[in-house]
Amino acid sequence: MARRFLCTIILLFAGVLTLSAQSLPDGLYARMQTNRGTILLELEFERTPLTVANFVGLAEGTISHSRSGSPRFFDGLRFHRVIADFMIQGGDPLGNGTGGPGYTFADEFHPQLRHDGPGVLSMANRGPATNGSQFFITHVATPWLNGAHTVFGRVVEGQNVVDAVRQGDTIQSVRIERVGPAAEAFQVDQQMFNRLRTEAAERR
């Protein structure tokens, strides 16, 4: 009897979680599973289409990259740099801050996307137009990074997980969720990414 009751509770809880995912507002999301828990990120695909196309293409394995053994670029990588009360950084296949996908692309700065609080998703770089696969998520506002690093999303659930991540923790998977027609239409392939990359380079 107790076992049956427990199974019922588990099924009801799973149903609530599924409903929560289905009830997200229209948008493009990345569900990042870590060994500390899940981080749900909303991606700014309309304001920073190139940067989001890069992230989505790497996550889904639909654009070419230099990491061998896994088409889904981020799965299994570690948070190689964590600074308390600042940010967590991942996306480096080498795990030492020097790795990337084998290419770089231009910055995308939008006036309404700022490093204005906790949970900002932004690109790590080595200077102008050196974006690749490394990203960071903030613990606090970091306004000195505005105009130097491309903001392309924000945590909508799981900031407590961001705050719990420690250096060396693992990104177990990144899965993209599309809600609504605009997000559904944002399908990334190599041709789309190349076009956006060329257009951004020509605007510099």
What are these regions (language model features)?
Residues 1-9:
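Bacterial N-terminal signal peptides that target proteins for export
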Residues 2, 13-204:
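Cyclophilin-like peptidyl-prolyl cis-trans isomerases
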